[in-house]
């Protein structure tokens, strides 16, 4: 089989780069692999613009949850011809790595490679918002502000700690603006909306019983988000 492995260098530190190289070396032992490293969005987009030409059997993304979501959207945007046996593999190299938790993946090189070369794959539920797709979760309001405020370079250095720092900052200085949303024909004014296609939130914190392989999207609408109501919802 012909593999395409794309590693988002912005998603991880040097230690994870060593891990990616170990996986790559193991994968190359019995397979053909085209390997790409990207530092910019434009570099990644260029790869996907030419993706149809190579007739890849597998796409492997080494990066975070956002890297996988980006890849899916670029494949669709560029009208990729999905073969019946085409599959996307994943090497966790991001910060939160919700997908790693969702798939109950371990961090052993041999185990990851065995999954990547296997034919044991399943279709994931894909959700569309406007012109973009997501497969884990999408939010607008409180947590979206936190994610948007985080500098990618600082996140690469501090890892998950930066989410805690920014989360605490936005918790202390909560300043919500009402959002207008229509859901199932009913109108709401809300402070935070979270649509989840996964059981996990913010790492390994379980919020649902669903998973990415089930058509059971769960949407939370926080109409009056306060510090107390947020703590109650989390705990």
Model regions: which residues?
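Short glycine/serine/threonine-rich phosphate/pyrophosphate-binding segments
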Residues: 44, 66-71, 98
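Cofactor-binding loop segments of dinucleotide-utilizing enzymes, especially the Rossmann-like FAD-
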Residues: 8-10, 93, 222-224
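ATP/NTP phosphate-donor binding region
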Residues: 1-62, 73, 111
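Catalytic phosphate-donor-binding core of small-molecule kinases
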Residues: 117, 167-179, 213-235
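Glycine-rich phosphate/pyrophosphate-binding beta-alpha loops
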Residues: 139, 143, 194-206
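Catalytic core of DAGKc-family lipid kinases
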Residues: 6, 38, 77-192
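Short, solvent-exposed amphipathic alpha-helical segments in soluble enzyme
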Residues: 20-23, 52, 76-77, 151-152, ...
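Short amphipathic alpha-helical segments
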Residues: 17-19, 72-75, 101-103, 206-207
């Amino acid at each position: 089989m012909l593999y395409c492995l794309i590693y988002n260098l912005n998603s991880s530190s040097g230690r994870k780069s060593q891990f990616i190289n170990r996986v790559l070396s193991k994968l190359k032992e019995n397979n053909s692999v085209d390997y790409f490293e990207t530092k910019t969005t434009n570099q990644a987009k260029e790869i996907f613009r030419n993706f149809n030409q190579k007739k890849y059997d597998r796409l492997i993304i080494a990066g975070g949850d956002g890297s996988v979501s980006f890849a899916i959207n670029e494949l669709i945007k560029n009208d990729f011809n999905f073969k019946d046996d085409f599959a996307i593999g994943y090497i966790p190299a991001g910060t939160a790595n919700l997908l790693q938790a969702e798939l109950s993946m371990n961090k052993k090189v041999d185990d990851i490679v065995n999954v990547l070369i296997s034919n044991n794959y399943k279709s994931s539920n894909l959700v569309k918002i406007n012109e973009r797709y997501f497969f884990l979760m999408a939010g607008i309001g409180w947590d979206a502000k936190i994610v948007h405020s985080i500098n990618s370079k600082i996140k690469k250095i501090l890892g998950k700690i930066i989410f805690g720092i920014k989360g605490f900052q936005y918790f202390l200085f909560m300043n919500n603006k009402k959002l207008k949303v229509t859901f199932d024909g009913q109108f709401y004014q809300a402070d935070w909306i979270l649509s989840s296609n996964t059981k996990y939130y913010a790492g390994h914190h379980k919020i649902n019983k669903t998973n990415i392989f089930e058509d059971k999207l769960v949407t939370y609408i926080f109409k009056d988000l306060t510090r107390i109501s947020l703590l109650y919802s989390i705990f």
